[in-house]
UniProtKB/Swiss-Prot annotation:
Chain's gene name: VP
Compositionally biased region (Gly residues): 379-390
Residues spanning the membrane: none
Main subcellular location: virion
Keywords: Capsid protein, Clathrin-mediated endocytosis of virus by host, Host-virus interaction, T=1 icosahedral capsid protein, Viral attachment to host cell, Viral penetration into host cytoplasm, Viral penetration via permeabilization of host membrane, Virion, Virus endocytosis by host, Virus entry into host cell
Source organism, top-level taxon: Viruses
Protein name per its UniProtKB record: Capsid protein VP1
Disordered: annotated span: 315-366, 373-392
InterPro entries given in the database record: Capsid/spike_ssDNA_virus (IPR016184), Capsid_VP4_densovirus (IPR003433), Phospholipase_A2-like (IPR013607)
Species this protein is from: Diatraea saccharalis densovirus (DsDNV)
Length: 809
């Protein structure tokens, strides 16, 4: 509360309570005091106070605004003004008031000793005084000083307190001295007056909110400077016709008011709004050397004494003080003790020390006593039986040691260029077996091996990853660049070709989950038709030796190690990714059927892929697919260290069924004889050398789970395919005779860019001071089962089995 409000309140006589005007009544009692007290409406105080708070240059404008804004308040409180000016006190209706007895000098001295000039603290209701009248007078003294400090009054627990809370006496909102036409542009208003009228009014609201959260004078100054900068921006924008002029008037008034306020603050040293709620402690160096002087002058709050700048140390913020509040607030709230301060204010006086060095009367302990007692080491004075008088001190919680190992996220991105062929559909039959059981229907859909690590990182990047590393997300973007259709210019009349053939492009996601086929690598083609595959082998990822060998994805993309690759210098053995060159996708999707099973023919694969006219999608991203593995471990998981006796824990009751890693055995695909049986598999923590090989699948949720009795919902990573449909060679009508098969195809190929990116998470925690490797707790340990899942076979109901890989066909 400002000087003007304090003076007005003081002249109104001791005992007046200022509450919001919308609850003015003569029925509110002071609880235990029980005296009906006439009330002075806050509206009139607000009108006078906030007119002066704007600053001298704006005093005239503020006075006019105050009169206009609070005209009705001034009229309703005319008798209150008359009381203040004449000294003949009446209530709001003009009736004479019953005069109170003045507070005795004894009560004032008692209050000085108890509160030590600090009225931010709560009123100690449990003080045991000689008479009830002393407590009544002490409360009047306490509330009188709180009003002078601009703080809300304390209501004792009684009828008056309950009534005040039920009527929300201390929660009413005030308008403040706002500029006409605005809701927040001006001092003293509340923070919930509805939506701002325009942009400068919104800036003023943000400024008020910053005030309400300010804990230091620096934060108040920062809030002022921020508002002034925004106001000047509005003025400049209006001059440049970038903003409505409606903000300009308010911006000029607001900036002028803040500037005037800061000038007055610099001259007087008084900060508005008040940040006096900051609890201050006397610097320990003065406590030791000036102890007698401090004890003598602290009851008067060092009035009239020029103190050193470092006399106080401000350590407690406004939010930590139970009575702290900002000048701009929604409403005054009753003084309430925080849990950490209950020991300071609620201690029974009978338990206080009767030491002659304790200057407190009636057994009340003060902050000075605590400070002085703690500043006399070795004397034993002022201490309790526990070795130190901790009454009134906050609880000190000793920080616990903790190491946050954190998680490191690394992103690996590669850009590959691949060539695909417009392969023709052809049925490949098994040879050398009676009955020709296996049948493959070839397609042009080339597999993009995004389930394999080499697509994202080279050998060194993989080797340098620590144990426990796992892929948390991978993403692939497939961009179709263009296609090429070739033909022989010297062809005979039966194999003519033109330049305007139609070529279609196909894309598919998740064909592996259908269970209708598998990926294969082609090892032979028809001699006179290079677009027709005639033989196949298992898909190629790692290096394959022999006539149909493959260098492997690592050597193909990134090159081989010159120290151990005998073919390092051979022609064509260069790192395609490293030089931005094209290489080939090795595997293509094939549908599969066993002829002795009544499967019902070839299913409609076209329902599950998308087709495009290749001429319309050049340089277009046709696939952008992301996947988050359920269990993407790519390095051996962290282990736990067993300590205690016995190391072999024996049987442990877990109170429920163990969620063992079960496997389903499916036999007899025919509907009539199909059976699904369950097998429970024990958890194992050892891993074969190839389990976390660079060519292992990223998704391992069918084989791994977390914790000794944890459970995972297994899944497989969906496949990605892109293909260029075979382009037929144009011929004469000979093919229409006797329904001759179409087996003449033009050489065609397509070019695609694949941008592959994966995010790897790693963490290296340790809980033992001499552990030589990272470790974790048993609940985070990863276990495996002994089922060898084979992703080179077709899936069943969305998961892979452990059947053998189909050999060469």
């Amino acid at each position: 509360m400002s000087f003007y409000a304090r003076a007005l309140t003081h002249r109104a006589r001791p005992g007046y309570r200022i509450i919001p005007e919308n609850t003015v009544t003569e029925d509110i009692e002071l609880g235990a005091i029980g005296e009906e007290t006439p009330l002075l409406s806050e509206g009139i105080i607000t009108a006078a106070e906030e007119t002066a708070a704007v600053g001298l240059p704006e005093l005239g404008v503020g006075a006019v605004g105050a009169v206009g804004t609070h005209a009705d308040v001034l009229y309703r409180n005319r008798n209150a003004f008359k009381s203040v000016l004449t000294g003949n006190y009446t209530d709001l209706k003009g009736n004479p008031l019953k005069q109170r007895n003045a507070i005795s000098e004894k009560t004032k001295q008692l209050g000085k000793q108890i509160f030590q000039g600090d009225f931010n603290r709560a009123f100690p209701d449990n003080l045991k005084l000689e008479t009830e009248q002393e407590k009544t007078d002490l409360l009047r003294y306490y509330n009188h000083n709180r009003r002078l400090a601009g703080l809300s009054e304390a209501y004792p627990q009684g009828k008056g307190y309950a009534y005040a809370k039920s009527q929300k006496v201390l929660e009413a909102e005030k308008r403040g001295l706002t500029v006409p036409g605005y809701k927040y542009l001006g001092p003293g208003n509340s923070l919930n007056r509805g939506p701002p009228t325009n942009e400068i009014d919104a800036d003023a609201k943000e400024h008020d909110e910053a005030y309400s959260q300010s804990k230091t004078a620096q934060e108040v100054s920062k809030a002022d400077n921020t508002f002034v900068n925004k106001a000047l921006d509005h003025v400049v924008n209006a001059i440049n016709l970038k903003e409505s002029p409606s903000n300009t008037v308010g911006a000029i008034i607001g900036a002028t008011g803040i500037g005037t306020k800061q000038a007055i603050e610099k001259h007087t040293g008084v900060i508005y709004p008040s940040v006096s709620g900051m609890s201050r402690e006397i610097n320990p160096k003065y406590l030791n050397s000036w102890s007698d002087w401090i004890k003598e002058n602290k009851p008067n709050n060092f009035a009239g004494i020029q103190l050193p700048e470092d006399f106080y140390t401000e350590e407690q913020t406004l939010s930590d003080s139970p009575m702290s509040e900002s000048t701009k607030r929604k409403a005054d709230t009753p003084a309430e003790e925080t849990p950490s301060k209950k020991g300071a204010h609620n201690t029974d006086s009978s338990s206080q020390s009767a030491d002659p060095q304790n200057p407190s009367s009636s057994g009340a302990t003060t902050d000075l006593d605590v400070t002085m007692a703690m500043s006399l080491p070795g004397t034993g004075s002022g201490t309790s039986s526990g070795g130190g008088n901790t009454t009134g001190q906050e609880i000190y919680e000793i920080p616990r040691p903790f190491t946050n190992f954190g998680k490191k996220l690394s992103t690996y991105t590669k850009s590959h260029k691949f060539m695909i062929f417009g392969l023709a559909n052809n049925v490949i039959a098994e040879t050398g077996t009676t009955g020709n059981l296996h049948r493959l229907l070839t397609t042009c859909l080339a597999e993009i091996p995004w389930q394999k690590i080499p697509l994202y990182m080279n050998q060194s990047e993989f080797d340098l990853l620590p144990p426990g590393s796992r892929i948390v997300e991978c993403n692939v973007k497939v961009i179709f660049r263009s296609n090429r259709i070739a033909f022989e210019t010297s062809s005979t009349a039966t194999k003519q070709a033109t330049l305007n053939q139609i070529s279609n492009l196909q894309t598919a996601v998740g064909l592996n989950k259908l269970g209708w086929g598998i990926d294969r690598s082609f090892t032979a083609f028809q001699s006179d038709q290079p677009m027709i595959p005639t033989a196949s082998a298992p898909p190629k990822y790692a290096s394959v030796s022999g006539a149909n060998g493959y260098r492997g994805m690592i050597a193909d993309y990134y090159g081989a190690d010159s120290n151990n690759d005998i073919a390092f210098g051979n022609a064509g053995n260069y790192p395609h990714h490293q030089v931005g060159s094209f290489t080939f996708l090795q595997n293509y999707y094939c549908m599969y059927i066993q002829t002795e099973r009544g499967t019902g023919g070839w299913p409609c694969l076209a329902e599950h892929f998308q087709q495009y006219d290749s001429k319309t999608v050049n340089n277009q991203c046709l696939l952008d697919v992301s996947y988050k593995p359920q269990m993407g471990m790519i390095k051996p998981p962290l282990n736990y260290n067993i300590i205690g006796f016995p190391t072999n824990k024996g049987a442990i009751s877990i109170g429920e069924n163990l969620t063992a890693m079960r496997s389903a055995n499916v036999s007899g695909p025919e509907i009539a004889t199909q059976q699904v049986s369950e097998t429970s598999n024990n958890r194992i923590h050892n891993f074969p050398a190839t389990f976390f090989d660079i060519y292992a699948d990223i998704e391992k949720s069918q084989r791994l789970n977390k914790g000794p009795w944890g459970f995972e919902h297994p899944q497989i990573q969906p496949s990605i395919h892109i293909g260029m449909q075979a382009v037929p060679a144009l011929t004469t009508g000979a093919l229409l005779v006797n329904s001759s098969p179409l087996n003449s195809w033009t050489d065609s190929m397509g070019y695609v860019d694949v941008i592959a990116s994966c995010t790897v998470m790693e963490s290296q925690p340790t809980h033992f001071p001499y552990a030589t490797s990272a470790n974790t707790n048993p609940g985070n340990t990863v276990y495996r089962n002994n089922i060898n899942v084979n992703s080179l076979t077709s899936a069943f109901n969305g998961l892979y089995g452990n059947a053998a890989t189909l050999g060469s066909l």
